[in-house]
């Protein structure tokens, strides 16, 4: 895995820190209210330092994010991309990630993925997983391929009538 250059030179890409907590929560709430917002609140409430959240900033405004997992990320701070980590020597994970709707169509999605990949490579990961996505054509240009796929199975259970 090689370090790749970012397209956008007018934005700052960096790891979050505890001082970003309120801005990151507000950013998530404004763009993805619900689960992702709750995950950020829970992350900081569980002792997260911000290190697992990568930010793209336009001046001081968060305009994109990616959550990453490092081989040494605590179990209570990991995302789904890291559930396989015991099967790898030094697994890294990317996801979830997103770009503020006002900043889309500027290749920031590409850059936040590349930045996440670069950060994980610099942290000596052996492999990187992006879990639970259907966006295969988005991730393939960055060297990602399907490793596992899931099939959902269902069974209709007919309700039995009881006679009383």
Regions found by a protein language model. Give the residues of each.
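A short beta-loop-alpha structural element at the N-terminal edge
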Residues: 10-24
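A conserved mid-domain beta-alpha-beta active-site/ligand-binding segment of alpha/beta enzyme cores
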Residues: 28
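A conserved beta-strand-loop-helix scaffold within acyl/acetyltransferase catalytic domains
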Residues: 32-98
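Conserved active-site alpha-helix within GNAT-family acetyltransferase domains
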Residues: 110, 122, 126, 132-152, ...
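Extended hydrophobic-aromatic, low-complexity segments
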Residues: 24, 35-37, 64-66, 74-79, ...
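Conserved acetyl-CoA-binding loop-helix of GNAT-fold acetyltransferases
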Residues: 96-99, 105-118, 141
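Acyl-donor-binding surface of acyltransferase catalytic domains
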Residues: 1-8, 153-157
